[in-house]
């Protein structure tokens, strides 16, 4: 699932409102994605009650946050592996009386200032204590990943520059994460084995991790907070209200959609398209403070990934016509400011 975080209308709206964009922006996008998945599953499983489905939504969001912590511990595991390798080197040199010429790469990695902060972070330690041995079970993978990282041009350039300032240490970790962990089929496979709830979350959660790396400073100590699961209580409420409004107003919202299907019978529409439009309309009619462009663009992004190739364009046109009619009838005061570039893609 790929979101254009920096260019999304949500980003610009939250920035103008002086809200903590590093948390709210990502959480809202993740919430919308989860609501789409869970609403789709709700209709596929007709025996499921609304209360059970709501609990599943809450659990699914909790699992996404666990994935965030889980991925941060990959970096800590790599650091610990580097420390073990360097300890072997030191013991060997002590035994043989030899000495390493120049810089010892394993020591440099193990002494990385940002990774030291992460290893000592209280929140991450608490998470790891409750899940002992999670990456130790994947020792072969950690070894292979570490080898790829230390043999890479990114790491070699970092070593060659011999700039081991805090900023350089943090930046090399960010680059290495983006290059070797963000796009890693082996990690994706392991994640899927650990939890089916993590299947579609990784690309969004990777952005959480990258933002977290940038939030640390040289003065960050063990109490440095990680990103909270919800930036504000309104985000938690947003998830529950959006899901419930979508289901409870389902018949009404589907009738609205049905009225605007011109050349297609309603029954011939892709089911995912109907679900996405139903949720988008629920958001438009339930949350007055969310700008129309934000709602449009977030669900069009989801449609590009989760539905048919032409769905985004079709949904865009349908929603645009529906909202104009709703505004004309006085059911919403929202007006679309202007079509964004992604609407016409």
Regions found by a protein language model. Give the residues of each.
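Aromatic (phenylalanine/tyrosine) cluster motif
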Residues: 3, 11-13, 22
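Class I Rossmann-like S-adenosyl-L-methionine
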Residues: 17-345
């Amino acid at each position: 699932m790929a979101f254009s975080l920096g260019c999304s209308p949500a980003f610009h709206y939250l920035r103008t409102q002086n809200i903590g964009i590093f948390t709210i922006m990502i959480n809202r996008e993740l919430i919308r994605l989860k609501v789409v998945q869970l609403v789709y599953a709700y209709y596929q499983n007709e025996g499921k009650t609304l209360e059970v489905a709501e609990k599943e939504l809450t659990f699914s969001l909790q699992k996404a946050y666990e994935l965030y912590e889980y991925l941060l511990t990959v970096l800590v595991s790599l650091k610990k592996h580097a420390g073990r390798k360097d300890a072997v080197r030191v013991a060997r040199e002590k035994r043989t009386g030899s000495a390493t010429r120049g810089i010892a790469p394993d020591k440099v990695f193990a002494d990385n200032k940002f990774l030291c902060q992460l290893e000592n972070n209280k929140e991450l330690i608490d998470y790891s204590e409750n899940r002992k041995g999670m990456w130790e079970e994947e020792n072969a993978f950690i070894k292979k990943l570490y080898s790829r990282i230390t043999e890479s041009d990114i790491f070699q350039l970092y070593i060659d520059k011999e700039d081991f300032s805090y900023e350089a240490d943090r930046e090399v970790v960010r680059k290495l994460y983006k290059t070797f962990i963000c796009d890693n089929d082996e990690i994706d496979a392991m994640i899927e084995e650990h939890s089916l709830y993590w299947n579609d979350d990784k690309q969004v959660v990777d952005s959480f991790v990258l933002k977290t790396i940038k939030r640390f400073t040289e003065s960050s100590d063990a109490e440095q907070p990680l990103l909270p699961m919800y930036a504000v209580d309104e985000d938690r409420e947003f998830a529950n209200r959006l899901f419930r409004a979508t289901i409870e107003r389902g018949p009404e919202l589907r009738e609205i959609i049905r009225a605007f299907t011109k050349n297609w019978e309603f029954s011939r529409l892709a089911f995912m398209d109907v679900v996405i439009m139903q949720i988008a309309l629920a958001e438009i009619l339930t949350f007055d403070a969310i700008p129309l462009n934000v709602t449009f663009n977030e669900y069009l992004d989801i449609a590009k990934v989760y539905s048919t190739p032409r769905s985004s364009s079709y949904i865009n046109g349908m929603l645009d016509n529906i909202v104009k009619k709703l505004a004309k009838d006085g059911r919403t005061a929202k007006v679309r400011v202007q079509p964004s570039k992604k609407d016409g893609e």
